[in-house]
Each structure stands twice: as structure tokens, then as C-alpha cells.
Curated annotation (Swiss-Prot):
Xref: InterPro entries: Glutathione-S-Trfase_C-like, Glutathione-S-Trfase_C_sf, Glutathione_S-Trfase_N, GST_C_Theta, GST_N_Theta, GSTT1/2/3, SANT/Myb, Thioredoxin-like_sf
Protein name: Glutathione S-transferase T3
Every GST N-terminal domain range: 1-82
Family matches, as Gene3D superfamilies: 1.20.1050.10, Glutaredoxin (3.40.30.10), Homeodomain-like (1.10.10.60)
Organism (species): Arabidopsis thaliana (Mouse-ear cress)
Any one GO biological process: toxin catabolic process
PROSITE patterns assigned: GST_CTER (PS50405), GST_NTER (PS50404), MYB_LIKE (PS50090)
Keywords from the named record: Detoxification, Nucleus, Transferase
Domain (GST C-terminal) ranges: 89-232
Location(s), subcellular: Nucleus
Top-level class of the enzyme under EC nomenclature: transferase
């Protein structure tokens, strides 16, 4: 059976295994596992590697993970592998093992930790952490010094005084090439003091060409994207002598051809949205309409201007270029569409949930349903987790039609928005149309308050009329009794006593007025009870959502605090379990 290699080329250990197989002409099938799409957590891949990490291989009946173990196995199992990669000499093998063990506890935490906390954090939904980056940089600098003065001592081209590369050379070089995503000045600041290290990286690259550059092509493209984003961020902060090019439908024209060309180039460039930006956009959409609105004719264009202002004023995005309101609207439309579709898939998976299945298992089933239905991967899990418990979002985008098979038609939501429901896809969900044309609704509190005031005024008016009518009837009744007393003959005591014993019967108008008052009192009491219950339910739902979010944030902060404390200690101060925990936390961050 042909060897299968499960890898993601943005992963340093994955690149080492792929280059090794290609250089030694080992026939294999490469199966891509995209970490950004959480494919490593799928049930199919966890059957191969229960830890859910890449790389992993399947060779016949053997399923193996951990890049160092994979490289050792391939070197021993395949005759085409040249001896210098993993020598048969036991003393040389032992020294290679010592380098590999040192790599996992020194160079990898330093290099990976610095890149994560200074560049790649936002791409993974984590904030940049200058303090953690500084601590990782100290470990990286120390590791580079050890590499330069101990492992590369002498005039040899490779580690341990060898003139040919080993699996240790390949593994460590792939680790350091991850620094390519840094700014050029930052990378040179770290590597330039270590000339032996720079020459050794180049020697390993040449020894494994052309496969080295081919496997690293994904990383080089990521480097170019990071560099362009840094250039855009610099261009968005003009100095006192620079010229600002205005981008608007009514902007001023420029006679300078260079400015016109620069404007065209900047318009062509499209900056991708990070998870952190998505989180701020969702927060802006959820919170903006809660502000006081003084006019019922509040158009959607003004609404998106306010969302754009909310987004651009966020402190966590201060170092990034500003987004236009139209950009926010386009991103929200795309994000909302995909999340709505995934909700339908998740509901379907939830209905088919069997006993023993966890929430992660249900998510994986929903992910597979989405992939099968829409022929693409669902990459917005972070947005789905933010919106799924939002009362406002759920009320505006109901999902009763997501499982139906009715005809394709437009319907109306509670707020009057037009939606489109298609029968061609049983998992289709309603999507709001014509956002620019619709008039924004007033906040729920304002409308309900106005309706309540109108109802109270109506009830008070009815009660006042009934009270006035009852008062007039009582006055007429008293006058009638006085007239009867005046007309009675004197001395007729027996008749007078008989009439006093008989209670006066209410008129039809009195009975109707009393019944009306009773019904109104009952209706008003029932209405107040319903409002109290609804308000109580709303508060409980909000508290529960906040509690869940706080728990998740607390878990994340706890893991980061544990990792920071472990990174602040030297290897000699860590027990074996603490060392394993530190490496596991670093891998989770990446």
C-alpha cells in the first residue's frame, strides 16, 4: 500500500516530512489538512491521529504522528534513503537525537512563540501580545546563540560537524524558515548576528533543491501578503510631507499621473478580513441599533456609517488601515449569508444527534453537511459562535424555512424585511434583501414603550368615560328616588317598609359598564404578567449567554497564563509533565 502523508504546508514539521520524502524519492500521496479550516479535528483525521495534529502518516497498517518519529521511521524503513540522513552508526544517531530533543524544548518554543505573538496571532483569532513576544524573543535569541556556537561549531556545512545534512538539519531549518513572515528588518535583526546560522540555512536549502522551494511556496506567498499589509498600514499613516489620496465618489481629481497610478493600485488591492476584525464587526452590528434613534426614517446607509465609525474606533484595530462603511456592509452580507446556511446544517445535525455525541461531534457533522451541500468549506466558525446566542440576530433571521421544501418565494420577517427562500436546497435559509431601501426599525424598547403608552391612554380614556357614565346613572337614580318619596301618600308605613327591603336592580347600562371594567382589568393584569415574564426570560437568556462567553474567555486566559509562566522558566526548572504541557499549549496556539 502506498504511503500517505497528511500535512499542511504552513506547518513547519509538515514541510520537513514532505521535503524529506521528495528528496529521497519516496513514493507517497499528499493529503492536505487545512488547519485554518479545523480539518484536523474531523472524525476521519482523528481516526488517524487522535491528537488532531499534523503531520501524520499511514503506511500499511501503521498510523504514526510526530514529525521526528516519522522522519526516523522513514529513514529506517525505506532503502532509498541515503545513510547520512539517519546514520547506522549508533553514536551519530544518538547525537542526532540530542539535537531533535533540544529543538522541541528550545528553538521551537522561541521561534513559534515569537511569530505567533508578533504577527500570526490575529489570523488565529488571538490578540498580539508584546510581552509574550518579548519573552519568546529572549528564548529564540538564546537558542540561536547555542545553535551558532555549539551545534554548528567548526567549519562544517551542517550540524554536528557533518558535511552532509541529517534529519536534524531539515527539521531545524524548516522551523527557522517560519521567520519569513516577519518584517525583513525584524528577521535580519534576529539572524544577522549569527552568520554561521544563515550560511547553514542556505546550505540545507541548496542540498534539498528544488524540493525545498517548491514545498515552501505557500510560506513565501504568505510572506508577500504580510509584507503588502504592512506597506498598506504604513501608507495609511501619512507623514507631514506626504500627500493623501482621497477615495470617495466625489473626491478631488489629481493631475499627477503617479498619484493616479498609486490610487488605482491601492484600489485593486483587497485586504482580507481577520478573525479579530470579524468579531469587532459583529459587535458593531449587534450594538449599534441599541443607541437612541430620534427619527423613524433612519435609512440603512446612515446605519452602516455608524457601524463603520464603531468599527474604526475600536482600540484593538488601531494599527490597521480603516475600513469604509461599504466594506463593512459587504463583509457582513457575506458573513451573515454563510452563517445562516451553516445554522440550517447545524440544526439538521442536531436533529440527528445520537446519545454520546458531544457538541464538537455535532459541529463536525454540520461541517460535513455544509461542505456537501455548498461544495466549499465553512471557515466562519468564530462568527457562528458569536451570533448563535444573539437574541437580536436570531429574531431578525428566523430559520423555520431552513428545513422546508416549499416553493421559491419571498416572505416577510417580523421587521418587514424581504427575504428569499429557495426550494432547490432543503438546507437553504432566508436572506434579507434590499438593505439600502429598507427603513431601519426603532429599538425594541422604544417601540414597545410607545405602544404601551398608547394602550394605557386608550384604557384610561375608556375607564374615564365609564366612570362618568356610572356617575350620571347614580345621580339619576337618586333624583328618581327623591321624586318617588315626594309623590308617596303620608302614613303608608307598611308599603314603605316593603319597598325598603327590596334592593334596587341595576340597569342594563350599569351591568354593561361593570362587565367592561372587569374585562379591562383582567386584560390589563394579564398583559402586565406577560410583560414581566418576557422581561424575565430575556434577562435570563442574556445572563446565560454572557456566562458562557465569560467561561470561554476565562479558559483561554488560563491557558495563556499557564503558558507564560512555563515560558518564563528554564528547561532545567521544568518537570517532564510541565515540559510536555508547555509544548502542547504552544502547538494549540499555532
Amino acid at each position: 500500500m502506498k504511503l500517505k502523508v497528511y500535512a499542511d504546508r504552513m506547518s513547519q514539521p509538515s514541510r520537513a516530512v514532505l521535503i524529506f520524502c521528495k528528496v529521497n524519492e519516496i513514493q507517497f500521496d499528499e493529503i492536505l489538512i487545512y488547519l485554518a479550516n479545523r480539518q484536523q479535528l474531523s472524525p476521519e483525521f482523528k481516526d488517524i491521529n487522535p491528537m488532531g495534529k499534523v503531520p501524520a502518516i499511514v503506511d500499511g497498517k501503521l498510523k504514526l504522528s510526530e514529525s521526528h518519529a516519522i522522519l526516523i521511521y522513514l529513514s529506517s524503513a525505506y532503502p532509498s534513503v541515503v545513510d547520512h540522513w539517519y546514520p547506522t552508526d549508533l553514536s551519530k544517531r544518538a547525537r542526532i537525537h540530542s539535537v531533535l530533543d533540544w529543538h522541541h524544548t528550545n528553538l521551537r518554543p522561541g521561534a513559534a512563540g515569537y511569530v505567533l505573538n508578533s504577527v500570526l496571532g490575529p489570523a488565529l483569532g488571538l490578540p498580539l501580545n508584546p510581552k509574550a513576544a518579548a519573552e519568546a524573543e529572549q528564548l529564540l535569541t538564546k537558542s540561536l546563540t547555542t545553535l551558532d556556537t555549539f551545534w554548528l561549531k567548526g567549519n562544517a556545512m551542517f550540524l554536528l560537524g557533518s558535511n552532509q545534512p541529517s534529519i536534524a538539519d531539515l527539521s531545524l531549518v524548516c522551523e527557522l524558515t517560519q521567520l519569513q513572515v516577519l518584517d525583513d528588518k525584524d528577521r535580519l535583526r534576529l539572524l544577522s548576528p549569527h552568520k554561521n546560522v544563515e550560511q547553514w540555512i542556505e546550505n540545507t536549502r541548496k542540498a534539498t533543491m528544488p524540493h525545498f522551494d517548491e514545498v515552501h511556496e505557500v510560506l513565501f506567498r504568505a510572506k508577500d501578503r504580510c509584507q503588502k499589509q504592512r506597506e498598506m498600514a504604513t501608507a495609511s499613516k501619512p507623514g507631514p510631507q506626504s500627500k493623501i489620496i482621497q477615495f470617495s465618489t466625489i473626491g478631488e481629481k489629481s493631475d499627477d499621473p503617479n498619484l493616479v497610478q498609486n490610487t488605482t493600485d491601492r484600489r485593486k488591492h483587497r485586504r482580507k478580513w481577520s478573525r479579530a476584525e470579524d468579531a469587532i464587526l459583529i459587535s458593531a452590528w449587534l450594538n449599534t441599533s441599541k443607541d437612541p434613534i430620534v427619527d423613524n426614517e433612519h435609512k440603512a446607509c446612515a446605519f452602516w456609517k455608524r457601524i463603520g465609525a464603531y468599527f474604526n474606533n475600536s482600540a484593538s484595530l488601531a494599527n490597521l488601515p480603516k475600513r469604509e462603511p461599504s466594506h463593512c456592509k459587504q463583509r457582513w452580507s457575506k458573513l451573515n449569508d454563510k452563517v445562516c446556511k451553516f445554522v440550517g446544517c447545524y440544526d439538521q445535525a442536531l436533529n440527528q444527534r445520537s446519545s454520546g455525541q458531544s457538541e464538537d461531534d455535532v459541529f463536525q457533522v454540520a461541517y460535513q453537511v455544509y461542505t456537501n451541500n455548498y461544495k466549499s468549506n465553512f471557515t466562519l466558525e468564530h462568527a457562528w459562535r458569536e451570533l448563535r446566542h444573539s437574541k437580536k440576530w436570531c429574531s431578525l433571521y428566523p430559520f423555520e424555512n431552513s428545513k422546508g421544501g416549499g416553493s421559491s418565494k419571498r416572505t416577510k420577517l417580523n421587521n418587514g424585511d424581504r427575504v428569499y427562500s429557495s426550494s432547490s436546497n432543503p438546507e437553504s435559509v432566508p436572506i434579507a434583501l434590499d438593505e439600502e431601501e429598507q427603513v431601519m426599525d426603532l429599538p425594541l424598547g422604544v417601540k414597545s414603550s410607545k405602544q404601551k403608552e398608547k394602550k394605557v391612554a386608550t384604557i384610561i380614556t375608556i375607564e374615564e368615560r365609564e366612570a362618568d357614565s356610572g356617575s350620571r346613572l347614580e345621580n339619576l337614580w337618586v333624583l328618581d328616588e327623591e321624586e318617588q318619596v315626594m309623590d308617596r301618600p303620608l302614613g303608608v308605613k307598611s308599603l314603605e317598609q316593603k319597598e325598603n327591603k327590596v334592593a334596587p336592580k341595576p340597569t342594563i347600562e350599569e351591568r354593561e359598564a361593570a362587565d367592561s371594567r372587569s374585562r379591562l382589568e383582567n386584560l390589563w393584569a394579564l398583559k402586565e404578567k406577560e410583560e414581566r415574564e418576557a422581561d424575565s426570560r430575556s434577562r435570563l437568556e442574556n445572563l446565560w449567554a454572557l456566562k458562557e462567553k465569560d467561561i470561554e474567555e476565562q479558559k483561554k486566559l488560563t491557558r495563556m497564563e499557564v503558558l507564560k509562566s512555563l515560558l518564563g522558566r528554564t528547561t532545567d526548572q521544568l518537570s517532564e509533565k510541565e515540559d510536555i504541557l508547555k509544548n502542547k499549549l504552544i502547538d494549540e496556539m499555532l
